[in-house]
């Protein structure tokens, strides 16, 4: 079962279909108790995949900070601004998040919200690069990321949606959406890491999540550039209906 959760986490963490929503659905389907510490371990595994995916950008930022280059200092500050709302929401709404993990009817609604955001994202045109990003833009993206703390709302989908809304070019929007997710995923994982029980099963699950995470990143990149997010939008409608029905049965 841990391997299955690893596959689900790896594929759904970056594909814009909500990993937390899917993990909740699978937990309910197989009568597993939602465990935020397990989710945190899987998040840390997929975090490693993000670091590889945006490795070039991260290296440039680190080098720029070491050299005290103004544009990289400003970019780092904007990434921090995009992170703050999620941190605040996470602290204030922790109990509600845990409750929503077991309520499939609420998750079903949030899947529909994600579907709508993806459908709109396919129609947005942008040509801005990161040099034009303002602190207000960064805050908008941060609010989108904050909303994604609820299962069913995709973090990658909503941060990408926010990045496109403020006019970023599609591939740049995708890369920025993952740059701003790094502190949030890392923070969530570190907060729960003290409760994680490492064993052969959990480690295997994390390794599987890492490799499937890499696969899903490249799938999302292709879908974003070719404006095929509608495929994931349609899937979110399907999983919304499925989770709603499952919530009524279980």
From Swiss-Prot:
The keyword Cell wall biogenesis/degradation applies. The keyword Cell wall biogenesis/degradation applies. One of its GO terms (biological process) is response to antibiotic. Coiled coil: none annotated. It comes from the Bacteria. It is an enzyme of class 3 (hydrolase). It is found in: Cell inner membrane. It catalyses: di-trans,octa-cis-undecaprenyl diphosphate + H2O = di-trans,octa-cis-undecaprenyl phosphate + phosphate + H(+). It is a multi-pass membrane protein. One of its GO terms (molecular function) is undecaprenyl-diphosphatase activity. GO terms for cellular component: plasma membrane. InterPro entries: UppP (IPR003824). The chain crosses the membrane at residues 35-55, 73-93, 100-120, 146-166, 171-191, 200-220, 229-249. Its EC number is 3.6.1.27. Keywords: Antibiotic resistance, Cell inner membrane, Cell membrane, Cell shape, Cell wall biogenesis/degradation, Hydrolase, Membrane, Peptidoglycan synthesis, Transmembrane, Transmembrane helix. Bacitracin is thought to be involved in the inhibition of peptidoglycan synthesis by sequestering undecaprenyl diphosphate, thereby reducing the pool of lipid carrier available. Belongs to the UppP family. HAMAP family: Undec_diphosphatase. PANTHER family: UNDECAPRENYL-DIPHOSPHATASE. Catalyzes the dephosphorylation of undecaprenyl diphosphate (UPP). Confers resistance to bacitracin. This is Undecaprenyl-diphosphatase.
């Amino acid at each position: 079962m841990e391997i299955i959760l690893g596959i689900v986490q790896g594929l759904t963490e970056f594909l814009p279909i909500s990993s937390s929503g899917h993990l909740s659905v699978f937990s309910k389907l197989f009568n597993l108790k939602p465990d935020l510490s397990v989710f945190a371990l899987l998040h840390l595994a997929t975090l490693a995949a993000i670091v590889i995916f945006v490795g070039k950008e991260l290296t440039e930022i680190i080098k720029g900070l070491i050299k005290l280059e103004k544009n990289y200092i400003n970019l780092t500050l904007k990434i921090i601004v995009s992170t703050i709302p999620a941190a605040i929401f996470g602290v204030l709404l922790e109990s509600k998040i845990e409750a929503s993990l077991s309520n499939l009817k609420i998750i079903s609604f949030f899947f529909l919200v994600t579907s709508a955001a993806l459908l709109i994202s396919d129609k947005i045109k942008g040509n801005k690069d990161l040099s034009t990003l303002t602190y207000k833009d960064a805050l908008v993206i941060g609010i989108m990321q904050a909303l994604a703390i609820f299962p069913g709302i995709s973090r990658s989908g909503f941060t990408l949606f926010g990045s496109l809304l403020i006019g970023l070019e599609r591939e740049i929007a995708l890369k920025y959406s993952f740059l701003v997710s790094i502190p949030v995923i890392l923070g969530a994982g570190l907060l729960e890491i003290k409760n994680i029980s490492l064993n052969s099963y959990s480690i295997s699950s994390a390794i599987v999540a890492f490799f499937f995470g890499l696969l899903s990143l490249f799938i999302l990149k292709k879908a974003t550039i070719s404006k095929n997010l509608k495929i994931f939008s349609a899937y979110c409608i399907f999983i919304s209906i499925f989770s709603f029905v499952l919530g009524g049965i279980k």
